[in-house]
């Protein structure tokens, strides 16, 4: 299951994404959910750091790029919240566990449960079957997609945020911790859209200038009829090419759509852009996947 067949590899190269149902067991998914429950129960976020996560461009710049809480989260475990969950003083308007959009961006490095999933033999075998020589883990996120108001993620390419030279060196690994359905906000892809380069980049502003990030280029209008929904069952793994266009809709159902996702970069012969918002640090250089 972890080693891709020639036909699976061909489909991934053709479409820019690939679904592998049953990659993780129900027990592994439960272990992640239980651990996240413990992390959330211990959550202590200062008022000035209660950053609402948004996927619309201007709101991204205001809510993320202008705050050091986001820009310095690459080597930490931090909390990002849905829109409208705080009053004007930063107090929760909904139960805290229902307010979180995601936790990022270093669960893979600092938490034993997520570290073991990320570096599992299955994941390493999968990476080897993709031909990755020296993959490193650049970031990880636990995404909640809360019931009733889990925010939409507008069409984008991961390489807009995680840019490399040459392109084609970033791979998203998206694991369904719960069933992802049409109703609760499954992923949608434009098959084959990974072959046209990157139309937009989010770059970190020079030190001392504001805001913290800005966008170069713009996201072109996408033909909605080209998007294909990708509902999957709990335990499925979705491989996501760094340049494939994908999105997810708002979750208006009464069930969450939790997922654990991390990004790999082929480090051999690759330059990680110094303009990316996310940078390796002395405390956490990008860890090697193969252990």
Curated annotation (Swiss-Prot):
The keyword Metal-binding applies. SUPFAM superfamilies: Clavaminate synthase-like (SSF51197). Transmembrane segments: none annotated. Keywords: Dioxygenase, Iron, Metal-binding, Oxidoreductase, Phosphoprotein. The keyword Phosphoprotein applies. 2-oxoglutarate binds at residues 102, 141, 156-158, 174, 248, 257. It is an enzyme of class 1 (oxidoreductase). Its cofactor is Fe cation. InterPro entries: Phytyl_CoA_dOase-like. Its EC number is 1.14.11.-. Activity is increased by ascorbate. Inhibited by myristoyl-CoA. The modification Phosphothreonine is found at residue 55. Fe cation binds at residues 156, 158, 246. It comes from the Eukaryota. One of its GO terms (molecular function) is metal ion binding. Belongs to the PhyH family. PHYHD1 subfamily. 2-oxoglutarate(2OG)-dependent dioxygenase that catalyzes the conversion of 2-oxoglutarate to succinate and CO(2) in an iron-dependent manner. However, does not couple 2OG turnover to the hydroxylation of acyl-coenzyme A derivatives, implying that it is not directly involved in phytanoyl coenzyme-A metabolism. Does not show detectable activity towards fatty acid CoA thioesters. This is Phytanoyl-CoA dioxygenase domain-containing protein 1. It comes from Homo sapiens (Human). The lineage of its organism: Eukaryota, Metazoa, Chordata, Craniata, Vertebrata. The gene is PHYHD1.
